[in-house]
UniProtKB/Swiss-Prot annotation:
InterPro entries: 60S_ribosomal_eL6, Rib_uL2_dom2, Ribosomal_eL6_CS, Ribosomal_eL6_KOW, Ribosomal_uL6_N, Translation_prot_SH3-like_sf. GO terms for biological process: cytoplasmic translation. There is a cross-link at K5 (Glycyl lysine isopeptide (Lys-Gly) (interchain with G-Cter in SUMO2)). Component of the large ribosomal subunit. The ribosome is a large ribonucleoprotein complex responsible for the synthesis of proteins in the cell. SUPFAM superfamilies: Translation proteins SH3-like domain. GO terms for molecular function: RNA binding; structural constituent of ribosome. This is Large ribosomal subunit protein eL6. The modification Phosphoserine is found at S126. Belongs to the eukaryotic ribosomal protein eL6 family. It is found in: Cytoplasm, Cytosol; Cytoplasm; Rough endoplasmic reticulum. Residues 1-25 have a biased composition (Basic and acidic residues). The modification N6-acetyllysine is found at K238. The keyword Acetylation applies.
Length: 287
């Protein structure tokens, strides 16, 4: 109305204490709205005894949950499965004669008429595996022709020998020489030798070509039988060194001994036997 005075807007600023009181009232109203009655929180029916281990087993939980009452149905696939055509193994054929029963069941796949007298072994797939004869024979970088090696096993353990060459089987051909340390021409594995830094130049030494693995292969000695000869004649055949071995030993050693004598103190070094004494540690020894 024209006679009434218009109300003036409240331009006075509220004090900070009043603002805090208003904010507190609003927060209480929000909390009242948020508070809703809650039920029991969801938890497993199998209480945990220790981390990862429950009180009940899987079979016990199967019965506790009554999972046996559930009906499971396999999902229907949209792709139609092709039905496999069964190949018949037999065929029923009619047979004449009153007393023959009228029919016979005959196999479609006939068995072979004749069988081999001996079983022929069938070759199996090797899956890329090579036979032992075709394995790559790697030689240690420290072992070269003329290197003096220390044998660690066998009857000649501790003795120093001269390395000649590597054979086809991967074994090392070594010699003492025989006159110095009683080690003949023989084979040894590179696992069981220590390569020293001492070397001899054997570039001019001629090693016979027939010194191969078959040359050193151990021959089987004949065992006596009671049928042959007398009953009490039970002496076994003894191993004897062949003349060929003696000739080859002299031919190789004569060439190597000349080169050994040219180096001072090398003969005594090859005669000496390697051994560890107190205070000598193998990992600190320089060979």
């Amino acid at each position: 109305m024209a006679g009434e005075k218009a109300e003036k807007p409240d331009t006075k600023e509220k004090k900070p204490e009043a603002k805090k009181a208003d904010a507190g009232k609003k927060a209480k109203k929000v909390e009242k709205v948020k508070k809703v009655k809650k039920g029991k929180p969801h938890c497993s029916r199998n209480p945990v005894l220790v981390r990862g281990i429950g009180r009940y087993s899987r079979s016990a939980m199967y019965s506790r949950k009554a999972l046996y009452k559930r009906k499971y149905s396999a999902a229907k696939s949209k792709v139609e499965k092709k039905k496999k055509v069964r190949v018949l193994a037999t065929v029923t054929k009619p047979v004449g004669g009153d007393k023959n029963g009228g029919t016979r069941v005959v196999k479609l796949r006939k068995m072979p008429r004749y069988y081999p007298t001996e079983d022929v072994p069938r070759k199996l797939l090797s899956h890329g595996k090579k036979p032992f004869s075709k394995h790559v024979r790697k030689l240690r970088a420290s072992i070269t022709p003329g290197t003096i090696l220390i044998i660690l096993t066998g009857r000649h353990r501790g003795k120093r020998v001269v390395f000649l060459k590597q054979l086809g089987s991967g074994l090392l051909l070594v010699t003492g020489p025989l006159s110095l340390n009683r080690v003949p021409l023989r084979r040894t594995h590179q696992k069981f030798v220590i390569a020293t830094s001492t070397k001899i130049d054997i570039s001019g030494v001629k090693i016979p070509e027939h010194l191969t693995d078959t040359y050193f292969k151990k021959k089987k000695l004949r065992k006596p039988r009671h049928q042959e000869g007398e009953i009490f004649d039970t002496e076994r055949e003894k191993y004897e060194i062949t003349e060929q071995r003696k000739v080859d030993q002299k031919a190789v050693d004569s060439q190597i001994l000349r080169r050994i004598k040219a180096v001072p103190q090398l003969q005594g070094y090859l005669r000496s036997v390697f051994a560890l004494t107190n205070g000598i540690y193998p990992h600190k020894v320089v060979f």
